[in-house]
UniProtKB/Swiss-Prot annotation:
Its EC number is 4.1.1.48. GO terms for molecular function: indole-3-glycerol-phosphate synthase activity; phosphoribosylanthranilate isomerase activity. It catalyses: 1-(2-carboxyphenylamino)-1-deoxy-D-ribulose 5-phosphate + H(+) = (1S,2R)-1-C-(indol-3-yl)glycerol 3-phosphate + CO2 + H2O. NCBIfam families: PRK00278.1-2, PRK00278.1-6, PRK00278.2-4. It holds the Pfam family IGPS. HAMAP family: IGPS_B. InterPro entries: Aldolase_TIM (IPR013785), Indole-3-glycerol_P_synth (IPR045186), Indole-3-glycerol_P_synth_dom (IPR013798), Indole-3-GlycerolPSynthase_CS (IPR001468), RibuloseP-bd_barrel (IPR011060). It is an enzyme of class 4 (lyase). The lineage of its organism: Bacteria, Pseudomonadati, Pseudomonadota, Alphaproteobacteria, Hyphomicrobiales. Belongs to the TrpC family. It comes from Rhodopseudomonas palustris (strain BisA53). GO terms for biological process: L-tryptophan biosynthetic process. Disulfide bonds: none annotated. This is Indole-3-glycerol phosphate synthase.
Length: 273
């Protein structure tokens, strides 16, 4: 398979250049300052964990490059409400259009429908996108270490923190973990999907989780479809999960979310994050 990440970067940089021409960053900065205040993405996750529950970042995703169209009856506000009713801690909304059929308007609509904090799920290459995310109400942004050099990752993180946002730092291998640990944000997501091939295995999280310092907040991403997958990752200390496709394919999203999160709390190992 071709290098998907390289293709995505090429069109994202064109998008960013066009967006800067259409709406100067000074204009976005004004909108960011007057936007609804950040809701505390990491804080919401920590509250769930403190209650002894799994913390779910539930994803609103219409399509993907590897699977094509995932959900036909795509209604972001209704899906957000279904996730909230099902016990999600936070939301993730795809805003990339060419590969995921997402849009910033979907994130805005989803956030307005619930009280949950929302992650703008996109490929971020420029601080302009961070300001753009906050101007549209995002509470958290994504830094993909595979897509950025260290200096750019730091600039993007600094911009997000300055705006009061949280950051999900995504890694896929040991080298990316070492680089991620140089950043300040506590939340590190282990993506079980290789973004250059789109191959998926939970063994990625199992290999990397023991190397992540205990003070960091670990998030398992991709390849999570059933309670057994959550239990498998919990055995290596991961109790926060980002799940999209498996829930997006269900007719009753609330029931599916509850079923995914259901388990005997007494069986949960102590001290997991």
């Amino acid at each position: 398979m071709s290098d998907i990440l390289t293709r995505i970067e090429a069109y994202k940089r064109e998008e960013i250049a066009a967006a800067k021409r259409a709406r100067p960053i000074a204009e976005l900065e004004v909108a960011a300052k007057t936007a609804s205040p950040p809701r505390g993405f990491v804080a919401a996750i920590r509250r769930k964990l403190a209650e002894g529950d799994y913390a779910l970042i539930a994803e609103i995703k219409k399509a993907s490059p590897s699977k094509g169209l995932i959900r036909v009856d795509f209604d972001p506000p209704a899906l957000a409400q279904a996730y909230q009713a099902g016990g999600a801690a936070c939301l993730s909304v795809l805003t990339d259009t060419p590969s995921f059929q997402g849009h910033l308007d979907f994130m805005v609509a989803a956030r307005e429908a619930v009280a949950l904090p929302v992650l703008r799920k996109d490929f971020v290459y420029d601080t302009y996108q961070v300001v753009e995310a906050r101007a549209h109400g995002a509470d958290c942004i994504l830094i993909i270490m595979a897509a950025l050099d260290d200096a750019t990752a730091k600039d993007i993180e600094d911009a997000a923190i300055d705006l009061g946002m949280d950051v999900l730092i995504e890694i896929h291998n040991h080298d990316e973990l070492e680089r991620a640990l140089k950043l300040r944000s506590p939340m590190i997501g282990v993506n079980n999907r290789n973004l250059r091939t789109f191959d998926v295995t939970l063994a990625t999280s199992e290999a990397l989780a023991p190397l992540i310092p205990s003070e960091r907040l670990m998030v398992g991403e991709s390849g999570i479809f059933a309670p057994a997958d959550l239990a498998r990752l919990e055995r290596v200390g991961i109790a926060t999960f980002l799940v999209g496709e498996s829930l997006m394919r269900q007719s009753d999203v609330t029931a599916a979310t509850r079923a995914l999160l259901a388990r005997d709390a007494a069986l949960r190992p102590t001290g997991t994050v």
